[in-house]
Design a protein with these regions (language model features):
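H/E-rich (His + Asp/Glu) clusters that bind or coordinate divalent metals
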Residues: 13, 156, 160-286
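Divalent metal-binding pocket/active-site signature
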Residues: 76-79, 90-177
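A general structural detector for well-ordered alpha-helical segments in enzyme core domains, enriched
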Residues: 18-22, 54-61, 84-88, 111, ...
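Short loop/turn segments at strand-loop or loop-helix junctions that form parts
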Residues: 33-38, 124-127, 225
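Short, flexible/disordered intra-domain loops and linkers
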Residues: 38-52, 130-138, 167-170, 202, ...
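Structural detector of well-ordered beta-strand residues that form the stable sheet scaffold
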Residues: 32, 69-71, 123-125, 156, ...
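Active-site metal-binding loops of divalent metal-dependent hydrolases
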Residues: 6-7, 76, 126-128, 160, ...
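Mid-domain alpha/beta scaffold segments of enzyme catalytic cores
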Residues: 1-118, 192, 241, 268, ...
Length: 286
């Protein structure tokens, strides 16, 4: 099982070896580690938040944790954002991370285009943003609709965009349709189902993803939102156990809402795909 969504936060950090021991205890053998955030997201006293230092930190950490991929957190509006993309790519990151905390997504278009040209994936936050600013409105799903025209970009929207889960599903429907019509000229959108949905909303959100009638089987990625500093084994197990039961229910009755005339859905292996099989395509390693 892989975990798409693991953060590096300020403060004490487990060694890569201890981190690996904890992830293995949770049944997680690999995934993504998202590097420390820039000052424009939050200034941390005593932390070196210069982009070069943050880049080296996530590369060094993942270098000691085989199976885990380094993702660089970039502010797409930084004056030297394109230089950051170039340098991070040359140094070997596996992808990029963006949270739109003070800007609308479209303002970073040039940076996203540069990332698309590298062939590396881009992970976005989506949904309510728990910080000290009124910033959630920057992260509603339809604010990302323009990405449909960023040729070659593979991107994910996190947390099922809670509380705008239905809006996210409708956005995926549009982008999925366009990608099927012109696969060489459009972007590819993935669901990052990392919690953000509280447990009481979780089953409904996952059922909407799979049972709306869209081709989602190969576009869903599972994560926890744990931190690499001290990976929470109990928390990761909780979400894996809950989600596995929900997935079993979906697989047992996949055609409940199938429209007459549509092909029957085969959701027999959706859990294995979301927790492992879909990762390689997201990374660009088909």
């Amino acid at each position: 099982m892989q975990d798409l969504h693991i953060h590096m936060f300020p403060g004490r950090m487990d060694t890569p070896d201890v981190f690996k021991q904890k992830t293995l205890a949770a049944g997680v053998t690999g995934g993504n580690v998202l590097g420390m955030y820039p000052e424009t997201f939050g200034k941390e006293e005593g932390e070196d938040q210069r982009w070069g230092a943050r880049l080296d930190a996530v590369l060094d950490f993942c270098g000691g944790a085989p199976g885990f991929q380094p993702f660089f957190w970039i502010d797409p509006l930084a004056e030297d954002a394109l230089e950051q993309v170039r340098c991070a790519t040359e140094k070997g990151v596996a992808g990029f991370k963006v949270i739109c905390n003070y800007f609308y997504p479209k303002e970073g278009l040039k940076t996203y285009q540069a990332i698309a040209e590298t062939g590396l994936p881009l992970m976005f936050h989506s949904g309510v943003l728990y910080n000290e600013q009124p910033s959630s409105g920057y992260n509603q799903p339809m604010s990302f609709e323009f990405l449909m025209d960023v040729k070659g970009l593979r991107f994910s929207l996190a947390h099922i965009s809670w509380p705008w889960c239905a809006e996210l599903v409708s956005l995926f429907g549009k982008l999925n349709y366009l990608d099927e019509c012109a696969p060489e000229g459009r972007s590819q959108m993935y669901y990052d189902i990392t919690p953000g949905t509280p447990p009481i909303f979780r089953e409904e959100a996952l059922r909407r993803i799979y049972m709306t009638g869209l081709r989602v089987k190969h576009r869903v990625l599972w994560g926890t939102d744990c931190i690499a500093n001290d990976y929470n084994v109990e928390y990761a197990r909780f979400w894996a156990d809950m989600d596995r039961k929900i997935y079993d229910g979906i697989s047992a009755d996949p055609n409940r809402y199938r429209v007459a005339g549509q092909d029957e859905y085969d959701y027999s292996n959706i859990w294995d795909l979301a927790t492992d099989g879909n990762f390689a395509a997201f990374y660009g390693k088909k």
